[in-house]
């Protein structure tokens, strides 16, 4: 399967749109 494109940068988030590229906002409050 295709991997999501997600830069390995620790970014805080409240929702997926706070994150770069195809990262999603994970339960611990950071993009991944």
From Swiss-Prot:
The keyword Disulfide bond applies. One of its GO terms (molecular function) is serine-type endopeptidase inhibitor activity. SMART domains: PTI. Pfam families: Squash. Disulfide bonds join 6-23, 13-25, 19-31. It is found in: Secreted. GO terms for cellular component: extracellular region. Keywords: Disulfide bond, Knottin, Protease inhibitor, Secreted, Serine protease inhibitor. The record marks 8-9 as: Reactive bond. It comes from the Eukaryota. Inhibits trypsin. The presence of a 'disulfide through disulfide knot' structurally defines this protein as a knottin. Belongs to the protease inhibitor I7 (squash-type serine protease inhibitor) family. This is Trypsin inhibitor 3. It comes from Cucurbita pepo (Vegetable marrow). The lineage of its organism: Eukaryota, Viridiplantae, Streptophyta, Embryophyta, Tracheophyta.
């Amino acid at each position: 399967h295709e991997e999501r494109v997600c830069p390995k940068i620790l970014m805080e988030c409240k929702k997926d749109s706070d994150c770069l590229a195809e990262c999603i906002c994970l339960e611990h409050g950071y993009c991944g």
